[in-house]
Curated annotation (Swiss-Prot):
Its EC number is 2.7.1.30. It catalyses: glycerol + ATP = sn-glycerol 3-phosphate + ADP + H(+). ADP binds at residues 24, 28, 283, 327, 428, 432. Key enzyme in the regulation of glycerol uptake and metabolism. Catalyzes the phosphorylation of glycerol to yield sn-glycerol 3-phosphate. Keywords: ATP-binding, Glycerol metabolism, Kinase, Nucleotide-binding, Transferase. The gene is glpK. GO terms for cellular component: cytosol. This is Glycerol kinase. It comes from the Bacteria. Belongs to the FGGY kinase family. One of its GO terms (molecular function) is ATP binding. ATP binds at residues 24-26, 283, 327, 331, 428. Sn-glycerol 3-phosphate binds at residues 24, 94-95, 146, 261. It comes from Mycobacterium tuberculosis (strain ATCC 25177 / H37Ra). Pathway: Polyol metabolism; glycerol degradation via glycerol kinase pathway; sn-glycerol 3-phosphate from glycerol: step 1/1.
Amino acid sequence: MSDAILGEQLAESSDFIAAIDQGTTSTRCMIFDHHGAEVARHQLEHEQILPRAGWVEHNPVEIWERTASVLISVLNATNLSPKDIAALGITNQRETTLVWNRHTGRPYYNAIVWQDTRTDRIASALDRDGRGNLIRRKAGLPPATYFSGGKLQWILENVDGVRAAAENGDALFGTPDTWVLWNLTGGPRGGVHVTDVTNASRTMLMDLETLDWDDELLSLFSIPRAMLPEIASSAPSEPYGVTLATGPVGGEVPITGVLGDQHAAMVGQVCLAPGEAKNTYGTGNFLLLNTGETIVRSNNGLLTTVCYQFGNAKPVYALEGSIAVTGSAVQWLRDQLGIISGAAQSEALARQVPDNGGMYFVPAFSGLFAPYWRSDARGAIVGLSRFNTNAHLARATLEAICYQSRDVVDAMEADSGVRLQVLKVDGGITGNDLCMQIQADVLGVDVVRPVVAETTALGVAYAAGLAVGFWAAPSDLRANWREDKRWTPTWDDDERAAGYAGWRKAVQRTLDWVDVS
């Protein structure tokens, strides 16, 4: 929808919620109405910094500047003033790790992104000496390069002056939600240093039962507690803070919702009951299953995480399968191979062939996440023959997205004992009809996309709105959810089984490729 849509009409009403979505490749601000309908947005990309193989960084200053710009632009384009916004929510790429000076606001180092694998030796050592079991038991996570704890340890050990600053109380840690919130509420002039339970649950540092930083876990990574933010509800009864009047919003708006991006998508998809699941297709894929107030420990390579917490209610938990490379594999076809000029062309190219021609592509660029958790894996194209073309590679790339999701669904069913009946989907790739049809075929269940596909921003808008009474209760959110498109399986059982067997065989070829000992 156009940035300027509705123009002056919007300013006649105060019935709007703003949502900041600070993602891996871009930052956007979106405005929603009472019906959960998007009425405006503005979005800006930021640089992907790749200093060496396996390292991925972002510039924290650029992230904040992009956040300020999208806020200013969407408010200006719609003629909205701060008094027209009932509340503001923040959702973000999780695990990405920032450290900055509380007095100057200057970062000590670039943000280390969730995809970054420089901490593989830290993670491997934790598992080798048995300490990984403590992390699994308390934090619900396996020791992996994915999570914030190892990234923060790396900064403390490798960036001059950071450990001393942390021990003196001068250095602050946060994921992007904390960084954006701190700057919006004043930065060095009294900015609020806080995160929510969902983001904290992705650090390997928070106890899932107490919802607090755990001293035993902190000691594993030698992290001073003083540098950590306060942990709060995803939609607290009192605002985290208010936007600084002299900041990009131009007035005081309460900030009342914070959710990690995948948790926000769960809320946006209204997966609020145990057994409901969604799959978000972005840079990576993230499939979550609501397990209610029960902490379900995975025996099949999944993560146990906080799904959300509203107000002072008990937290709701989830099982999650995190997949590192899905949408970014399509970007690889565009940026590194040059066989497409835009992501949308992947569908047209893949439609030139009826199948993958016996070729499988496993995009383990930075190892494999759920359910394998193998940082020693690297990408591979297998089954290649002279018969294969660019079209087969495009098809195999779309299939890789879907087969990785099948890996997670199978693990989820084994852990929960719940057979998936339908999969709600969201994210950019859901606009690719062929990919979604393949997903239905690979899983053998219907795949359903909602009218509002940007469920991440919508979810945190819901959280922020619930906190201020913009929506009275979660039941109001269900009335807003509407189906846009449904894909029904066309493969028979034999075709489905044969295709998946080939995928599993291909995955085995990617293992033990790099030494992480």
